[in-house]
């Protein structure tokens, strides 16, 4: 079977010669990477066009290391701490937030009596971000007995939260955020503030698809915690948005562009900010709208910038606004997890003879006969570099009997929303009749590679070699999420640059800096 030949080079099958397929072993990376030279990278951040407003809390740039791993000794201690955490009960969470977790993290039936173990990035985020919320005491004389009141220290904390795709980063930033919002409700001032028409915290994301996904997670906390949330979504009317801002909002999830278009917003009271997929929201297409929105939050106490890929240029850019940002990075950042089986298929060699379509049919045939996920329709995400190439491949697959969905930027919002809902929900049960293929293909571009949690997705095909290491990591990261097994096939031919392909594979093994 083709799938077996992908797993081990030494096992030929279906007439596929060993030289056509390379299985890439994910070699373990050393636990600690020693910090690079202090003093920042070469050159200065590229100047932007036009006027850009610096966010509140932004300071004059200071020399700072751009190495994402920071101090080696501190990283080692943090990793050991996270590895020793066996339950959320050991972390400093608000009791009400902790009580909701069993309903949010749905365990299989045979594990429901066990404690829920946080991922490494969740343990690190809660430990470091919650310890950084500092308060001071103020003695008040009321009547005969003096009282001691806790008030928050007026100082902004800024973090970068970096971990592999599928490692639970959404909960890693939501748990400290929600715990701190609940802690604020203990202060006497809350009795007045709870009636204000204001937004207490903002989560910025690059797409409405991701906004809906984060909003669905937040909805599970809403009633138990007594909080009010709102997430921007497809097809919302202006009246719906205006109604949401007409009351107190504890958590707002939206895109920078959507927020700029909303006239009723009141961000002046927001104390917490999360920028999810921050490397995207700080690139040239988004940075002006992102920084404009952040500048409207003068009372920020805590800001977290979350990403699966943290390049030196991104970190340098972020430190131009926040020189003392604290980096919270999980081990093996930028490396493909060991539970993902990664294989390279050289389509120049027999039996494909430079025909990627034949290689794709062979891969889909093997997947349809796999013993993995045999109780469900097996969903396969096939990535292409350009949306213009999707219609032709869709027609070819449909002519060969495969049901195909597409997701790309040229589709209208309603069509995109239908596809997103289909793949972020559980797959359909398998057709048990003989010769049923039980495979469904999603043809897409990078629009589906960022943040989307596709339920029970095991198989990914990189039909085109990604343009760069960042795209590569995000595409591969659609499978193998939350420790589940995944399989990735990357097709290469003579048109692909050997140096670029080898560089991607080197990154996948070692988790090198971008």
UniProtKB/Swiss-Prot annotation:
GO BP annotations, alphabetical order: maturation of LSU-rRNA from tricistronic rRNA transcript (SSU-rRNA, 5.8S rRNA, LSU-rRNA)
Domain Helicase C-terminal: 359-514
Gene3D superfamilies: P-loop containing nucleotide triphosphate hydrolases (3.40.50.300)
Coiled coil residues, start to end: none
Molecular function per GO: ATP binding; ATP hydrolysis activity; RNA binding; RNA helicase activity
A Pfam entry, by short name: Helicase_C
Cellular compartments annotated: Mitochondrion
Cellular component aspect of the GO annotation: mitochondrion; nucleolus
Motif (Q motif): 115-122
Highest taxon, organism lineage: Eukaryota
Main location: mitochondrion
Motif (DEAD box): 276-279
Domain Helicase ATP-binding: 150-328
Transit peptide stretch: 1-55
InterPro entries assigned: DEAD/DEAH_box_helicase_dom, DEAD_box_RNA_helicase, Helicase_ATP-bd, Helicase_C-like, P-loop_NTPase
Positions contributing to ATP binding: 163-170
Catalyzed reactions per annotation: ATP + H2O = ADP + phosphate + H(+)
Enzyme class: hydrolase
EC number of the protein: 3.6.4.13
Cystine pairs: none
Chain positions covered by the region annotation Disordered: 26-64
Described function: ATP-binding RNA helicase involved in mitochondrial RNA metabolism. Required for maintenance of mitochondrial DNA.
Comment on protein domains: The Q motif is unique to and characteristic of the DEAD box family of RNA helicases and controls ATP binding and hydrolysis.
Protein name, as recorded: ATP-dependent RNA helicase MRH4, mitochondrial
Organism: Yarrowia lipolytica (strain CLIB 122 / E 150) (Yeast)
């Amino acid at each position: 079977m083709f799938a077996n030949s992908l797993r081990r080079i030494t096992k030929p099958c279906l007439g596929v010669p060993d030289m056509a397929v390379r299985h890439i072993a994910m070699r373990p990376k050393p636990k600690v990477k020693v910090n690079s030279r202090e003093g920042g990278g070469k050159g200065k951040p590229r100047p932007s066009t036009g006027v850009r407003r610096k966010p509140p809390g932004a300071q004059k740039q200071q020399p700072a290391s751009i190495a994402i791993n920071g101090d080696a000794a501190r990283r080692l201690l943090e990793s050991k701490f996270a590895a020793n955490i066996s339950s959320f009960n050991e972390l400093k969470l608000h009791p009400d937030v902790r009580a909701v977790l069993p309903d949010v993290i749905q365990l299989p039936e045979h594990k429901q009596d066990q404690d829920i173990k946080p991922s490494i990035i969740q343990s690190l985020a809660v430990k470091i971000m919650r310890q950084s919320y500092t308060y001071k005491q103020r003695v008040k004389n009321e009547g005969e007995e003096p009282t001691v009141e806790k008030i928050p220290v007026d100082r902004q904390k800024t973090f970068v939260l970096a971990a592999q795709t599928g490692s639970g980063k959404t909960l890693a930033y939501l748990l400290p955020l929600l715990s701190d919002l609940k802690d604020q409700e203990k202060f006497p001032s809350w009795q007045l503030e709870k009636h204000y028409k204001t937004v207490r915290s903002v989560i910025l994301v690059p797409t409405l698809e991701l906004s809906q996904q984060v909003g669905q997670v937040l909805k599970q906390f809403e009633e138990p915690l007594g909080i009010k949330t709102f997430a921007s979504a497809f097809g919302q009317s202006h009246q719906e948005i205006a109604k949401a801002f007409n009351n107190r909002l504890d958590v707002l999830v939206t895109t920078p562009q959507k927020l700029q278009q909303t006239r009723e917003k009141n961000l002046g009271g927001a104390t917490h900010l999360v920028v999810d997929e921050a490397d995207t929201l700080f690139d040239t297409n988004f940075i002006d709208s992102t920084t404009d929105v952040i500048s409207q939050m003068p009372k920020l106490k805590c800001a977290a910038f979350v990403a699966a890929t943290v390049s030196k240029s991104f970190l340098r850019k972020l430190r131009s606004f926040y020189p003392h940002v604290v980096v919270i990075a999980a081990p093996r950042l930028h490396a493909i997890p060991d539970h993902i089986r990664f294989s390279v298929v050289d389509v120049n060699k027999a039996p494909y003879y430079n025909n990627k379509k034949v290689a794709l049919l062979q891969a889909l045939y093997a997947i349809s006969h796999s013993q993995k996920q045999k109780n469900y329709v097996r969903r396969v995400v096939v990535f292409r570099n350009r949306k213009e190439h999707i219609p032709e491949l869709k027609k070819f697959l449909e002519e060969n009997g495969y049901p195909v969905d597409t997701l790309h930027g040229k589709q209208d919002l309603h069509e995109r929303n239908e596809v997103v809902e289909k793949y972020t929900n559980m797959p359909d049960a398998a057709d048990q009749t003989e010769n049923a293929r039980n495979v469904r293909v999603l043809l897409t571009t990078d629009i589906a590679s960022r943040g989307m949690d596709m339920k029970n997705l095991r198989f990914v095909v990189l039909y085109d070699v990604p343009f760069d290491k960042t795209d590569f990591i995000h595409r591969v990261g659609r499978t193998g999420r939350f420790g589940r097994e995944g399989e990735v096939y990357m097709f290469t031919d003579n048109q692909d640059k050997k140096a670029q392909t080898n560089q991607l594979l080197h990154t996948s093994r070692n988790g090198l800096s971008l």
